């Protein structure tokens, strides 16, 4: 047992009491009372001994109840005793001294200590101190801190340090992160590290205050420094620690010098670590802790193993550890790497940065980065370019360069729409369109206003003469004869793109034509079925997307044309005026369309009152130069043609023409049987002027070329021509035909009259296709070719087809209203001439061609082949007047027509002159859907000789072929949304 130790030897106790009772609540501390007592006695200048003794007093302690303990050397203590005896001792202000006496030394029995210090405790204290000083705690820095601040203990080895730290982590006393070691506090897992560090420092300060009572070597006993200054015989109560401040400071300086020497010896091994630790030391200089950055010789691999060993145990519930920083916390970045200044990033040369990048990641080279950057920039530019809508320009350019694909696509849609035929969708569209829009195909039904296609050029500027025509085109009746025949030779398709080889796609498209009749649309809103070619498609500028505005402008400036012989019924729709069915608008009636040959093959159709019709046809035929165009008359249509005045002066002149045409028909054998057009029955007109009106409407050119054409063909050739003509509606779906025969002068002044549903247009027998000039469009084929087989065709058709007798739109004339055109004289001035048939005996009804401009397309439908009889379906009473029946053509006859057309087109291009209208010719040929195959025996010498014989006819025909756009433009100027019979059907329909 250790000997007892005397505490506070030679001390003196002073018992003080306040002078007033109220001062007890606010009793000052012991040190304050001590200073007040010493100051009061030091001012006793008259008593020098007392003043000197008071100045040497030392504060020993303060006890509750006003006991002040002081300590002084023995002579000073004796002076205080003598002054108290003489009542010369002065108390502090506000108090009085009640008693003064000596205190015996306090005896204390010291407790023995162990000679070893727990390393875990020392490590926890060191980590807490470093955390309070905001110094990163690593194994290296921890060892340095132990050497500097705990010199009395032995420095542990790296293995011992590693294992001790692991044990502390398992005991949840410390934890490790990528930033070092930290002390675990009650709030460690709930708040961030910053408050924890403050709490740690507070706890450490509290522990430091309670250190003197613990008696451990880790606690500083600076509080004992004051009594030790008084005692010369001071000694250390424990040899394992330095309890005195002077000795501790000296030892720290000595250890720092030794640490520097050791650091110099190991500088080569720990360069990067020393660099980092020097920065740490400089950062913690304000903590008044002597930090020695000297590293200790230990292996880094074990440090890694230690860090990973306890990582997952301590952080399983806190956060994902950053283990990758553990091994490189004191080694990254290397010393040779330049440090980039945060303020100015341009101090490091680019080559140095490139070298650093290559050192970090050799794969991520500068070249790859450059290429990637360029690629991404290009991608962003392209994305921005597309987002601005410039892709439309690219598509437009592509459309200009590849019009062939556009034509093929349009033709494919047209053929597909034919297959759909009588779909409910088509009927629904027909009802929704109303009577003011005449749809031709599904693509045309949607357009209510004429639009310029994307690929078409800008409309050209009109000349003054064209502007005059355009202004007066609204009312063609006011045009004088000097304004006609002005611009009809100009090319309306100038500037449009050529159609490249679009003919080659026609074969596949044409094969899609069905063989079933299609009933579409009611009478009130007539329209062409999707499967049949629209009879007004050529002239409908609103429903024909391929025609640009340029064509319309030029055609509007062209001469107005007076139509000749379209069939136009007189119904309530027409009685309402041209608002429902405007003039110059070919209204649908494909199922009622048939060739004149077919109408002649039907017996019993004509009655006695209808005998004047063949006379009118024959008379009108004899006034035209059909092929060669040698009689180009410059006469304008008289003003009488634009009215329904039955007393016109031209009736007498036309009687001779009727006689001529009757004589010509008898020569051709067309009047052998009472050919009827029962499918073309019109409403009966009871006024006496109908005969004269019919004659005025049918100013049909003379047939001078018929005899010349008949002379060039033998019987065998006529047989072949008849077979080639047997396909009705070449280039069309049904037996659609129109009788629109006009003279050369009429090609300039006449308009193609519209026809209402249930009434169709006629072409003359013999398969003669009529072009836009009123001339038959069958190159190298005469009317006698088909007339030679007329009787045979008639007999075969009657034998094979029990349904051969056609039915009209109305079973009798009473089913349909019979309005008189004379009721609307103001509107009749805009009604084209026309003639109508009805099953009942009627006289041909003629309507006025007031809107006579640009619509003289002559659709031809030839006699059907004898091997494939005509199927003329009879309508049911419920269907009458509602849905026209579209006639399909048979595939064998279609192929015959296609191959023969191939030869005719070749000869036409070889003999025809190269003119400015060639783009137009290609445009016409592209929409015909012809195929260029030749496997039907048409390549025989007979056909070639037939073509060469009529090459001269081709020249005259080609000159008249290009007047179609001029007709169409005038029609477009009337703002009439109608569809033509063909979509630019070429004149050669075989």
From Swiss-Prot:
GO terms for cellular component: cell cortex; centrosome; cytosol; fibrillar center; nucleoplasm; nucleus
Keyword Protein biosynthesis: no
Record's subcellular location: Nucleus; Cytoplasm; Cytoplasm, Cytoskeleton, Microtubule organizing center, Centrosome
A GO biological process held by the record: positive regulation of cell cycle
Biased composition (Basic and acidic residues): 396-408
Pfam families: Stork_head
Annotated spans, Disordered: 396-471, 562-586, 712-736, 809-832
Gene Ontology molecular function terms on file: RNA polymerase II transcription regulatory region sequence-specific DNA binding
Highest rank taxon of the organism: Eukaryota
Name of this protein: Storkhead-box protein 1
Tissue expression from the record: Detected in sensory epithelial cells of the inner ear but not in adjacent surrounding tissue (at protein level).
Organism: Mus musculus (Mouse)
Annotated InterPro entries: Storkhead-box_winged-helix, STOX1/2
Function: Involved in regulating the levels of reactive oxidative species and reactive nitrogen species and in mitochondrial homeostasis in the placenta. Required for regulation of inner ear epithelial cell proliferation via the AKT signaling pathway. Involved in cell cycle regulation by binding to the CCNB1 promoter, up-regulating its expression and promoting mitotic entry. Induces phosphorylation of MAPT/tau.
Compositionally biased spans, kind Basic residues: 416-431
Keywords, comma-separated and alphabetical: Activator, Cell cycle, Cell division, Cytoplasm, Cytoskeleton, DNA-binding, Mitosis, Nucleus, Transcription, Transcription regulation
Polar residues bias (residue ranges): 809-830
